[in-house]
């Protein structure tokens, strides 16, 4: 970085030169992530709090979207049953590349308290690829914010043209 005086502005101007276009594109992508919510149980209530004033994720550039075709990543929160796994996979497949998934809470990470149930999927990663796991039952909104920051690090570090693996078949589906 170099600082110089610009007589037209009347102050120090910091010039930043990026040698790779990928770095600039990834910085822009990481700072404007659109997300799709998939709240299924009590973690969905905590997910709603992330849009509130206390844990406002919009200050990090994360904006909710209603359509998977406009979303960069999906937040799966709560107990995923085999019937809902089909819908989660469908929503994931409708998202444009590159796409990411945050698994929020013990139930979506590994089945949680209900993992012995016959209809409960033993983790979202059995259905779709997961990039960030947020632990807790239910996790606090601050934990989801930390997961979002981790996802931004992942987006910044990988090439922007990276292709993701397709969604897997659900167990028992």
From Swiss-Prot:
The keyword Glycosyltransferase does not apply. GO terms for molecular function: 4 iron, 4 sulfur cluster binding; iron ion binding; NADH dehydrogenase (ubiquinone) activity; NADH:ubiquinone reductase (non-electrogenic) activity; quinone binding. The keyword Iron applies. InterPro entries: NADH_UbQ_OxRdtase-like_20kDa, NADH_UQ_OxRdtase_20Kd_su. Coiled coil: none annotated. It is a peripheral membrane protein. It is found in: Cell inner membrane. Keywords: 4Fe-4S, Cell inner membrane, Cell membrane, Iron, Iron-sulfur, Membrane, Metal-binding, NAD, Quinone, Translocase, Transport, Ubiquinone. It holds the Pfam family Oxidored_q6. Its cofactor is [4Fe-4S] cluster. Signal peptide: none annotated. [4Fe-4S] cluster binds at residues 42-43, 107, 137. Its EC number is 7.1.1.-. One of its GO terms (cellular component) is respiratory chain complex I. GO terms for biological process: aerobic respiration; electron transport coupled proton transport. It is an enzyme of class 7 (translocase). Binds 1 [4Fe-4S] cluster. It comes from the Bacteria. It catalyses: a quinone + NADH + 5 H(+)(in) = a quinol + NAD(+) + 4 H(+)(out). Belongs to the complex I 20 kDa subunit family. NDH-1 shuttles electrons from NADH, via FMN and iron-sulfur (Fe-S) centers, to quinones in the respiratory chain. The immediate electron acceptor for the enzyme in this species is believed to be ubiquinone. Couples the redox reaction to proton translocation (for every two electrons transferred, four hydrogen ions are translocated across the cytoplasmic membrane), and thus conserves the redox energy in a proton gradient. NDH-1 is composed of 14 different subunits. Subunits NuoB, C, D, E, F, and G constitute the peripheral sector of the complex. This is NADH-quinone oxidoreductase subunit B 1. It comes from Anaeromyxobacter sp. (strain K).
């Amino acid at each position: 970085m170099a600082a110089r005086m610009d007589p037209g502005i009347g102050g120090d101007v910091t010039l930043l030169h990026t040698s790779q276009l990928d770095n600039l594109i990834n910085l822009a992508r990481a700072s404007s992530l659109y997300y799709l919510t998939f709240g299924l149980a009590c973690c969905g209530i905590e997910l709603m709090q992330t849009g509130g004033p206390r844990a406002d994720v919009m200050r990090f550039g994360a904006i909710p979207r209603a359509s998977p075709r406009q979303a960069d990543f999906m937040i799966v929160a709560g107990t995923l049953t085999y019937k809902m796994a089909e819908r989660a996979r469908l929503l994931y497949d409708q998202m444009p590349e590159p796409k990411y998934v945050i698994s929020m809470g013990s139930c979506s990470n590994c089945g949680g308290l209900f993992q012995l149930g016959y209809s409960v999927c033993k983790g979202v990663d059995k259905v779709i690829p997961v990039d960030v796991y947020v632990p807790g039952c239910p996790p606090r909104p601050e934990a989801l914010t930390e997961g979002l920051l981790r996802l931004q690090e992942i987006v910044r570090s990988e090439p922007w043209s990276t292709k993701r693996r397709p969604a897997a078949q659900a167990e028992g589906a």
